[in-house]
């Protein structure tokens, strides 16, 4: 066990993020985080009173990363049209959800009440704001009510894809081999997003 001189809180969060992605949030505990960070079992309690506090921090980091990825997808090429940026953002969202499945699951898990964690709520809102901005750009003059409805509809579409493919429910329902559905969806995702936008 090492004597810690650096930023203990940041190291604990990093360890928690690693464990969450590798094994899922069910396998996270303050003790397992301490072991991963190679510090005493009491060390995490200096920064996190409960496991939920730590889960909220991991979830917040996930939303911050998602917002960053969506922003990068939207701004990667200044010559892209708003429609093209929307499609790239949708692709980036699904890719994030599939490649970081355990973190993604925690981000949308009901075990954390976002209302109890203002910074987590702000991070989640920031990620959703990226969708709001592009939908508003695609629909000049759209009312707030219609903007909300469209954003929720498009979010539900990509969120549903992540859930179906990530849990292999598509494979089971259509009789394909494990992993085939993911390849199909990834290959045709941009076409799907184009149709979703025109729906």
Per-range role (PLM):
Residues 20, 55-62, 70, 107, ...:
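Alpha-helical DNA-contacting segments of helix-turn-helix folds
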Residues 154-173, 191-199:
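Amphipathic C-terminal alpha-helical segment
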Residues 71, 108, 115-139, 148-152, ...:
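Amphipathic alpha-helical packing segments from all-alpha helical-bundle domains
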Residues 57, 71-99, 141-144, 150-154:
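Hydrophobic alpha-helical connector segments
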Residues 1-7, 74, 197-199:
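N-terminal intrinsically disordered/low-complexity leader segments
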């Amino acid at each position: 066990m090492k004597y810690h001189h650096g930023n203990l809180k940041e190291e604990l969060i990093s360890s928690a993020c690693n464990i969450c992605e590798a094994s899922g949030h069910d396998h996270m505990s303050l003790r397992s985080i301490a072991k991963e960070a190679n510090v005493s079992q009491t060390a995490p309690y200096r920064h996190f009173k409960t496991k939920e506090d730590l889960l909220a921090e991991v979830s917040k980091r996930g939303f911050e990363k998602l917002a960053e990825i969506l922003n990068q997808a939207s701004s990667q090429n200044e010559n892209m049209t708003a429609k093209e940026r929307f499609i790239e953002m949708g692709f980036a969202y699904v890719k994030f959800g599939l490649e970081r499945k355990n973190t993604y699951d925690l981000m949308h898990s009901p075990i954390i009440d976002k209302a109890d964690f203002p910074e987590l709520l702000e991070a989640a809102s920031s990620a959703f704001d990226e969708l709001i901005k592009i939908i508003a750009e695609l629909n000049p003059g759209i009312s707030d009510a219609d903007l909300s409805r469209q954003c929720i509809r498009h979010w539900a579409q990509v969120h549903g894809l992540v859930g179906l493919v990530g849990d292999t429910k598509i494979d089971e329902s259509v009789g394909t081999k494990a992993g085939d559905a993911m390849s199909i969806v990834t290959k045709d995702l941009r076409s799907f997003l184009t149709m979703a936008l025109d729906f």
